[in-house]
Amino acid sequence: MTRKEHKEGMPNDLQGGSRQSMTGRRTFLKGAAVLSAASVLKTGSAMMPAEQAAYDKYNALVIPRPEGLLDGEPVLQVPAPDSMGVAFAVTALANGFAEVADNPEMSNPMRFMAEGMPLAGIDDRVLKVRMTGLKPGTKYWYRAGAAKLEHPIGYWTKPSEIVWSKVHSFMTPGENAPSHFGMMCDTHANFKQMARITKKYRELGVPLMVWNGDIPNSLTNKREDFVKHYLVPPENDGYAADTPIVLNRGNHDFRGTAANRLCEVMMTRLPSERSPRDIALDRNFAIRMGEIALIGLDTGEDKPDHHPANGGFSCFTPYRIAQTAWLKDQFKRPEIANAPYVVAFVHIPLIELWPGANPGTILEDYAVWQKECADMWGPILTENKVQLVLAGHTHRYRYDSATPTRSWAEIIGGGRGNSTFQTLVEGKVENGKLVMRVHNTDAGTIVGEHTFAPRS
């Protein structure tokens, strides 16, 4: 079968150029990029009768358009200056796609296939696609899609037509992106409260959200728990279809037998975004949103590694040490070193909230603040004149000012509880200052506003 024969047998929606990366399967392939949902042609003179029968059976199979294949709207994630990830849930074995264009009409789009090589990451529940080759600080329009897979002959696989989502849009990070971001934390699978946050940040036009830990309520014992929390959260359909999510884990995100399967649902950063030394640090981030550099650090569990709750298989102290070396290197990058504003994200606070507060280094109870991380990271943040750390964990909004020996202030976001309220922490550069507004999304009010001058 020639390439020309294969292309002539393909429906129009599968014939265009397909652009994919080494991890995002990006190459311009004319016609042969995706298996045809229509006929496979082969000259009769080259075929034995049994082989002809197999091809006839393959060609005769007509896969109806699979209704209900897409389970919810796509979820944008792992934003980078030149790439954007998207994951979405499906109801049957399928291959995933995304098309992206620089115009709302979606003319001349680039098409990408589900991440993976040599096999695309087909799945019967979660599909993940990475759009690469993008420009920093640029608005794009995209749609996500899936093709159901059938097996008419043994392992021969035939896809249905692609079922597409609605067209959505996003902004890539970069120095010319809007100087605007948001942070939510400690949602703990309370989807009603989460819906108030997601509604608010969409109303405000926040172009990027950091989900700063403790997304589950308790143990995560199966992958479907992650699917519910991230891809199909009740009352929150479309919450990240136009607003990319940057995930920064909290202590609850490490609990349960499925905790290490998060990567099957939420994508990690490309290996090219970090050095070989830091290959295990696949969720740390350092990106620019306009004048603001955003840096993500993972404080891990709220108990020491030798605590019996960790079962002897955790290694959070070495993990924090590795992040310390990574953090130092981020300030050698010009786009981070030259940023007028730098905001770091941690789940567990880095400031001792009151004398004798549990520092996370003892067996009793659980950490209120993370002394080990504060000792490792705090001096680096101060040395580089970072203005702000955003945290969660305590479920109570709190503001601690900078001091003569500590350059950074700390804002703790609120979380669910009988005597607390959920917050959306919004950061935006206005009139030459970084203005942080803390929204009480339960009451619809602003409970705090804090202003920061550019770094000297």
PLM features: residue spans?
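N-terminal active-site segment of His-dependent metallophosphoesterases
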Residues: 67-72, 78-85, 90-97, 105-123, ...
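Active-site neighborhood of phospho(di)ester-bond hydrolases with catalytic His/Asp-centered motifs
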Residues: 183-185, 209-214, 245-251, 344-346, ...
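Extended active-site neighborhood of metal-dependent phosphoesterases/phosphodiesterases
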Residues: 131, 139-169, 224-337, 364-368, ...
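N-terminal twin-arginine translocation
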Residues: 21-27, 36-62
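N-terminal secretory signal peptides
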Residues: 1-23, 37, 50
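Short S/T/G- and acidic-enriched coil/turn segments that sit immediately N-terminal to beta-strands
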Residues: 124-130
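Binuclear metal-dependent phosphoesterase catalytic core
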Residues: 61-67, 73-83, 87, 97, ...
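Short acidic, glycine-rich surface-loop motifs adjacent to enzyme active sites
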Residues: 334-355
